[in-house]
């Protein structure tokens, strides 16, 4: 049976100079999404998408690699300055921010937007190893 020809949309190069880098760092993974000021995604990357699996996904090195690949893809759209929002308690927070800086993006502000409950849901029980 013949396969149908799938037409893929080519990425249109947008000329955006200012953006927002959303870094979500959990205990298991780090996801970096770079958007314009309105929240439209320009590029994204995560430790899992780069091939890190299991406990290696949560390392600072994996977060650094994810941040570098996302920033390189965003810089193709003309991105120069970025405002960073960090969410979550993971290990890759600082490493991801440093990688954005070393990739050549100018960081204008860093915000911590980690959601803090006003005593909402009961947290998971303590691990005993």
Swiss-Prot record:
One BP term from GO: translation
Superkingdom of the source species: Bacteria
Annotated keywords: Ribonucleoprotein, Ribosomal protein, RNA-binding, rRNA-binding
One GO CC term, this protein: ribosome
Keyword set includes Ribosomal protein: yes
Molecular functions (GO terms): rRNA binding; structural constituent of ribosome
InterPro entries: Ribosomal_uS11, Ribosomal_uS11_bac-type, Ribosomal_uS11_CS, Ribosomal_uS11_sf
Function: Located on the platform of the 30S subunit, it bridges several disparate RNA helices of the 16S rRNA. Forms part of the Shine-Dalgarno cleft in the 70S ribosome.
Family recorded in the similarity comment: Belongs to the universal ribosomal protein uS11 family.
Quaternary assembly: Part of the 30S ribosomal subunit. Interacts with proteins S7 and S18. Binds to IF-3.
UniProt name for this protein: Small ribosomal subunit protein uS11
Organism name: Macrococcus caseolyticus (strain JCSC5402) (Macrococcoides caseolyticum)
Gene name of the record: rpsK
């Amino acid at each position: 049976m013949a396969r149908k020809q799938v037409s893929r949309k080519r990425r249109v190069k947008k000329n955006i100079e200012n953006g927002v880098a959303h870094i979500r760092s959990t205990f298991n993974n780090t996801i970096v999404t770079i958007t314009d000021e309105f929240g439209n995604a320009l590029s994204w990357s995560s430790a899992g998408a780069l091939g890190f699996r299991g406990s290696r996904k949560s390392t600072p090195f994996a977060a650094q690699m994810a941040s570098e690949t996302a920033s390189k893809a965003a810089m193709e759209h003309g991105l120069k300055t970025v405002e960073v929002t960090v969410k979550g308690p993971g290990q890759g927070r600082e490493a991801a921010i440093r990688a954005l800086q070393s990739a050549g993006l100018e960081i204008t502000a860093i915000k911590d937007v980690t959601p803090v409950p006003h005593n909402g849901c009961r947290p998971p029980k303590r691990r005993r190893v």
